[in-house]
Every structure is written in C-alpha cells, then in structure tokens.
C-alpha cells in the first residue's frame, strides 16, 4: 500500500509543467520497514529523484498534459528477479521520499485542506500504516531468488545504516586553535634563561634558551624564543649589589697585594748587607787587577763582617726574648721561615771565585757569611772545614819554610865563621915560619 504525501510546488515549477494552481500534487512512496535503511548515494539518488516524482491531480480538476521532458512515466511493476533489483527500487523511492519530506516537513508549506488531510492521514503506529512485516519482505525476496543462492537472511547493502532525517556534519574546531594562532607567551613563573650580569654601565642581557619547534594540529609553527633586554636603570638593585661586590673584591685584592709587597720588600739590614757585598765584589775585582792591596781589602771585610755579626746577634736576642714564652708548635712553624732565608747570589759568586783563585782567607770569610744566612747549610759547612784544613797546611808549610830558612842562615853563618878561623890560623903559621 502506497502512502501519499501532499507536496507544495513552487510557481516556477508550475509554469514549467503547465499545471493549474488548484491541482494537489502528491508524491507516491513505497512501503518499507524501518529497519531497512539503504544508502542513497551516487547516480541512484539522482535516478530515484527523477523517476519517483509524478503528479497526481486532485478530483474536480482537469488533468494537464505533462511536458515531454519534465516528468518521466512511473516505473512498471517489479520483476521476479534476485534480491538486488528490488533493493535498488526501494533505494530510488526512498531518495524521492526523503527529498519530499525535507521540502514539506513544516505545516506552513502545505495548502489549506491538504495540510489537515495529511495530518489526519498520518498513522499512529507502523501497524496502522499497513507496512509489510519483515517476514513478508523476506518471502518476497526469497520468491525471486536465483537457484545458486543459499537460503537465509536477505542480503542488504554494505553501506552503514543511516536515518531518514538529514544530517549536517560540522567540523570540530580544536580547543587550542586560538592559542595556536596567537603568539606563544611564556609564563611569568617560568625561567627563560640565565641572567648574565656585566658592568653596571653596560646593558644587562639574558639569553633565553631557544625552544625547539613543535607540531600543532594545523601544521608546523615554531615557538618564538623570548629575549629579555633590560637597562641598568630598570634593575637598580642588581647593579648596586654588583657594584658592592666589586668594591669588596677590589679591597680584598688590594689587601692581598699590599701583604705580598710587604713580605717581598727587603729589610734595611738586608739592603745594607747587599751593598756591603757589592763593595766586597768590587774590591775583589780591583784586587785581582792589582789596584788595591790585600791588607786594605781584608781590613774592610773584617769591619763589615763585624757589623753584620752585631746586627744578627741583636736579631737573635730579640727573637729569643719573644720566643721564650711560646710553645713548641710556634717553633716548628718558625723553622721553615728560617730555612727560607738564603744567602744572596752575589755572595755565593764571590765565594766561588775566591775558591777557584785559591784565596782561602777570603773564601773562609765568605763562607762564614754564608753560614750566617744559612747556618744549617751542609755544603757551606763542608767547605768551611776544608778551607780551615787547607789554611792549617799552608801555615805548617810556611813554618817549615821559615825554619829551613833559619837553619840555612845559621849554617851559612857557621861556614863563614869557620872559614874566617881557618884563614886566621893560616896567617899565623906563615908568620911563625
């Protein structure tokens, strides 16, 4: 049983088809259960739209002849064919019925009494509509089934089921679309980089770590690396702290330099001793050239050595008076300080020259001065003992030479006296004869 739905036609359509305005057009849609929802896509939808529309004139009006290309004749009865052809026919009719329902879903589109008739003719349930059951449709499909098909449920379309209500697909907009389109702003609590403090006069720069570009839902959009550039006027606190630290560090450096300079400064006595050594070296050079006598040089050296010994004794007495109350730990600490005092290089050079020139008297005095600077120097002690032995040997040799010279002189005097006595006796003999 077919259900008729009244459709309102536009005036342009009436002009083209030459149908009177009193005609009540109706669209015939075939009966179909709710469970069968074949898809109307592709050329089948257009073919259904063309073949399903046909005008049924109302009673009391003369039918108008249709134009040659406006409408096509209604299709004939279904053939006894396999399951696929009736399903296609159903698809075509469904496409036409969907289009007609979409166009006349509201009651304002209907004309007068046709709207009330359509409302009154709508059944309240599927049983009143007179739609065939699923078993009936199954029997019709099995009657026209070919021989090769197996028994069972009818094959429906492979497309997913769709409802008869038109659906509108609205694309989903991601929630972070606006955030991605705008410039990425780093939060305040986040550290963009390390603050590099320079001189307070210069600008303070902070280089932020460049972030890697990340993929967004709409393509590649690299994040902007934020760089902060602030002048020293904007950060007075940091500049003051930096200047205070700089002042304290400069003061510490100045104190260290002053201490080092005071430690490295030679004392007045050491300067005097250096001058004395210079005089000795010059006198030694003059002596080697033959300009000055040895006696004068030795006298000057003895005087200078006496002054040096007096100064050293005074220093030792002062240190012993102060160190008498101190512990042994302080003495251990002072030990390396005493060891650090070394004899000047000029004194060592003069000593070596005297030793090579075999001037053992001068070498002995220079060795004594070296021992004054370095009393625990083993090399100086060995040289001093060797020089003393050499001097003793020289003294012994000189004494032996003097004795030999005395003996020679005495023997010579005795020989002279004997010669004189023999001459006197010979003279007396000659006189007696």
Swiss-Prot record:
Q: Composition bias, kind Pro residues: at what positions?
A: 63-85
Annotated disulfide bonds: none
Per UniProt, the ranges with Basic and acidic residues bias are 199-214, 244-258
- Bias (Polar residues) occurs at 114-127, 259-273
Superkingdom of origin:
Eukaryota
Q: Which InterPro entries match?
A: ERICH2 (IPR026703)
* Spans annotated as Disordered: 56-86, 113-161, 189-273, 308-344, 394-433
Quote the protein name from its UniProt record: Glutamate-rich protein 2
């Amino acid at each position: 049983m077919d259900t008729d739905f009244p459709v309102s036609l536009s005036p342009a359509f009436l002009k083209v088809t030459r149908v009177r305005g009193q005609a009540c057009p109706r669209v015939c849609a075939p009966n179909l259960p709710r469970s069968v929802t074949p898809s109307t896509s592709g050329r089948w939808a257009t073919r259904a739209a063309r073949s399903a529309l046909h005008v049924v004139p109302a009673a009391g009006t003369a039918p108008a002849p249709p134009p040659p290309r406006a409408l096509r004749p209604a299709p004939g009865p279904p053939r006894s064919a396999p399951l696929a052809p009736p399903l296609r026919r159903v698809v075509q009719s469904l496409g036409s019925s969907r289009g007609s329902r979409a166009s006349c879903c509201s009651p304002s589109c209907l004309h007068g009494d046709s709207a009330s008739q359509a409302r009154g003719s709508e059944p309240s349930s599927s049983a009143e509509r007179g739609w065939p059951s699923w078993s009936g449709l199954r029997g019709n499909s099995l009657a026209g089934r070919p021989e090769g098909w197996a028994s069972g449920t009818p094959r429906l379309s492979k497309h997913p089921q769709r409802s008869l209500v038109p659906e509108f697909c609205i694309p989903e907009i991601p929630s972070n679309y606006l955030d991605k389109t705008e410039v990425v702003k780093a939060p305040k609590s986040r550290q963009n980089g390390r603050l590099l403090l320079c001189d307070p006069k210069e600008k303070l720069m902070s280089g932020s770590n460049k972030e890697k570009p990340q993929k967004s839902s709409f393509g590649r959009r690299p994040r902007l690396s934020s760089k902060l550039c602030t002048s020293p006027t904007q950060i007075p606190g940091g500049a003051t702290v930096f200047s205070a630290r700089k002042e304290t560090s400069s003061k510490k450096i100045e104190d260290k330099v002053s201490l080092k300079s005071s430690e490295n400064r030679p004392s007045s006595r050491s300067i005097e001793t250096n001058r004395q050594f210079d005089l000795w070296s010059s006198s030694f050079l003059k002596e080697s050239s033959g300009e000055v006598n040895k006696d004068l040089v030795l006298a000057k050296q003895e005087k200078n050595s006496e002054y040096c010994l007096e100064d050293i004794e005074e220093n030792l007495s002062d240190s012993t008076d102060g160190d008498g109350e101190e512990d042994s730990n302080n003495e251990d600490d002072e030990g390396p300080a005493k060891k650090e005092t070394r004899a000047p290089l000029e004194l060592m050079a003069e000593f070596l020259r005297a030793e090579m020139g075999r001037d053992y008297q001068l070498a002995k005095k220079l060795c004594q001065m070296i021992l004054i600077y370095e009393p625990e120097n083993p090399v100086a002690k060995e040289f001093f003992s060797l020089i003393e032995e050499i001097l003793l040997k020289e003294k012994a040799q000189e004494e032996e030479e003097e004795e030999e010279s005395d003996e020679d002189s005495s023997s010579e005097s005795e020989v002279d006296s004997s010669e004189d006595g023999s001459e006197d006796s010979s003279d007396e003999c000659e006189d007696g004869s």
